[in-house]
Amino acid sequence: MLAPSFRDDPRPLRTAAVNVSQLAGHGKIHLLREGDEIKLFIKRGGVQVKLEVNHVFRGTVLPVEKRALNAEAGRIFTTDVSAPVLASAELYGSKLVAAMDRQHPRDIFDVLGLYNEEGLTPEIVECFVCYLAGHNRPVHEVLFSNDIDLSAAFENEFVGMTRNPIALSELQKVRARLKKELPARLTDGQRRFLIGLVAGEPDWKLMKCPHPVNDN
């Protein structure tokens, strides 16, 4: 069964809009629906924030974890909150699919953070394979994609978003490293699973994560 999404019922997002409007004070709230996409725009003064909800077509690969806002974020936003979130391995696994596919500087910057923290752990790679299996692009186009010119997205959609500036050349190095290392980290079982998936006969027993196996 497909998990419910805002595409089918946007009422939770409207509720979020009301809650945000109370926090935004005199800010303007705009809910935009374009086909299957629903976006919430919050604007106050010269600042605009876009809340874009990802469609959910699956459950989680790993059990969710309850986490508190880190100390620095709590200091900046003068608040303290805890929420159920994806496990780090699943969060990074899904991020790797985006970084390999669309190659947006934001995704590649997150991969840099991954490399600085723990690198490509077996659990992260396993989650990557799970998300790759559910992606809307062919497996080979993600694993062996051509390099996209990052310059326009870097200048127009990335510069100014990070606390410390980072050069485009650094992100290009991270992308090159990821495209070289990630395919090489796939286990024999993961490779056989993906080959079977492409052939229309996936062997789910080759996957170690319990949820995809139990759901198929």
Positions of the model-derived regions?
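Compositionally biased terminal segments of proteins
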Residues: L2-N216
